Amino acid sequence: MPYVNVPNDLSKIKTKMAFNLTKRQLVCFGSAGAVGIPAYLLTRGTLGNTGAMFLMLGIMLPAFLLAMYEKDGLPFEKVVRNIIRAKFLRPGIRAYRTENIYAPFAGPGAGKEDVIEKHKEKNGAAAKGKGRAALSAQQTIPYLSMHPDGVCKLPGGLYTKTVEYEDINYSVASTEDQTAIFSGWSSFLNYFDSSLPFQLSFINRRSHSRSRYQVNIPKADDNYNSVRDEFTGMLKNQIAKSNNGIERSKYITFGIPAEGIAEARPRLERVEADVMGNFKRLSVPSEPMDGRARLALLHSQMHPGSREAFRFSWKDIPQTGLGAKDFIAPDSLDFRQSRTFRIGQYWGAVSYLQIMASELSDKLLAEILELDAEMTVSMHIQTVDQLKAIKTIKGKISDIGKMKVEEQRKAVRSGYDPDILPPDLITFSKDAAELLADLQSRNERMFLLTFTVVNLAPNRQRLENDVFTVGGIAQKYNCALRRLDWQQEQGFVSSLALGYNEVEIQRGMTTSSTAIFIPFMTRELRMAGQALYYGMNALSHNVIMADRKKLKSANGMYLGSTGSGKSFAAKRELLNMFLTIPQDRIIVVDPMGEYAPLVRRLGGQVIEIAPDSPHHLNPMDVELNMAAGESPLSMKADFLLSLCELVVGGKEGLQPIEKTVIDRCVRLVYREQALGLETAKTPLLQDLYEELLRQPEREARRVATALELYCTGSLNLFNHPTNVKTDSRVVCIVLKNMGENLRKIAMHITNEFVSQAVDQNFHEGAATWCYFDEFHILLRDPLTASYFVAVWKMLRKKGCVPPALTQNVKVRPDRALCKAV
């Protein structure tokens, strides 16, 4: 959903009463004439005609300005009010100043009843919005009280709650998925009615060491601390570069008017449940914020660049006599400038987005939020009652019709074609008709939107650069970023995640044009604990930290073309895990020999499987100490059956009689081990071969003849006792020099070795990371693939984390086994 149409700002269409003038203009011009004309007549004899004329103009000019002047949609008197309020009525500098609740009782002659009565009077005046002008930083914060459950009381009897929500993948989604998300977000906005104002807050703040990802690689008493130091340095460097330390968070604050907290709380809880239900339908994780979390959020908004952690407990209020605002207020606020303000040591500027475009893209908000700058983007949204909205639009259409008639009359009087109308009038007429149709038949609602951007920077030059950059993005989409002159205080307090709006600039929008400001970009993967580093998010430029063992399934695959860095990424994960989680073990199945140098550097065991290699793995090895309910001999018999089937070959594989004979021989070969005799030795393939020759069935001789090549023949690589250290923490099995005749069998035996090692580690309480490089080779042969899929499914249940790597993602996609992996 790249673009949606935006309705024209119909507030520019004024209702004309008489003489083609609005009611405001008639009153102002009439008042000017009622005062100015008598003044002219009375002073004409004394001052002369010219002097009296200038006097009359001087008297009438303020009324003319009052009638005609507008700035940012505000009439003349409100512009003047903002200037007077900022320059004279309110102090420009607000210092941090506490109002300890115990202080009044310490004064001489202070009576308890008098103090309580004064406190009630002050709270009552503030609740009605009639409190005195803010004299301190604490008094600038507009809320009245914050409750532990997250309910906040604001002036005017408004109670609000806040929900924090996370991102989902929108930017990289398909067109169909983007359309579905847009439709769901539109329905979400339509949930709010005219009695439920809400605020969307998008906060970019620069994080510091305490809030950044922690590099959890502790030192150990081994030979790898130098590697740990180097790897830790790399991680810290990447974390420092991740979006230059910008953390992005998203919140929605909603409020309801109520007589008191008892009435507001249950209603807010119902709304909160509905909001979180709507987020869940969008697959957006969300979390309600309690009172302390909301205070921590306000603290972060009012302490830009601060490294101080938020320290607060509800017990601190009665113990210290301080209010909650004393824990979150900044050191100072300075609103003396018309276009900027100071908060602590930081500079700030509040601007609003003037939407002039006829259509908007879903990239506008995303591009603003992707900037490397500290900022708060706020969208205060007030739903207009549907009947009232339709009535208003019909009134605008009627006004446009009157303007058309007036223009046509002028055309007739002037002698030109009355069908020629001003282009703006035609555009407004068309847009108003379309807007009415949208409201009546297309499930659209009307919203009043206040879109503000608060930029913060450590110095004024950086601030102006950031504002200029945001303005450039707005201009790119045919919008304008305009500074709130003499309204910096109102803009700043409106940006706080309280649901309180003092900015009077509103833009009429429909559901679709409001929903196009989609707050989703890309899902971040940030997990705590023993999380490993997996690179940088290409869209958000944040680090990816994940603990695969905490996911629903730890299975994973590295996919990519040749040279794309699959092996490098797997080695980085392997090294990170080796240094971070010392109790876990690693097995690498390496067909190309790429991992051997790293494994040797980590003190692991490299097993080279090749005809001329001194390393041997005995496929007959069996571990009898397995968990209850498991039969190791039955599992070994199943493996040897599949091995013999691979050796015998043919389209039909082993026949039932052959399987029976093999199973009988396996039980005979392992008889001494099963009985637990001290003289029992681990058998070899040779033992199975000889046992088959002793059987009377001719099917046994057929299988034995097939095994002869691998027992007494030239390919007897696996007819030796295991002579390598298989209990090392890191084991790498290299299959690089295997010929085609041995490769299938080697792969099969390797799978069995991995399965047994994982079983043993699981029995000892250790997790195993099994890396299968070029794993598509394991899926070429149906029999090998079948056994590998069975092993793959078993690994997850045994506490294994199996990463697989391949560049051939289309290897037999029609095969069910490939799909199973």
Predicted region positions:
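Alpha-helical membrane-inserting segments
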Residues: 35, 39, 43, 62-63
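Membrane-helix interfacial anchor on the cytosolic side
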Residues: 64-82
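P-loop NTPase motor domains
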Residues: 168-169, 175-195, 205-208, 226-228, ...
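Extended, folded cores of ATP/NTP-driven motor/assembly subunits in large transport
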Residues: 56-60, 72-77, 88-94, 104-107, ...
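Hydrophobic alpha-helical transmembrane segments
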Residues: 45-60
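Short, charged cytosolic
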Residues: 1-9
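Glycine-rich phosphate-binding loop of nucleotide-binding enzymes
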Residues: 13-39, 147, 152, 168, ...
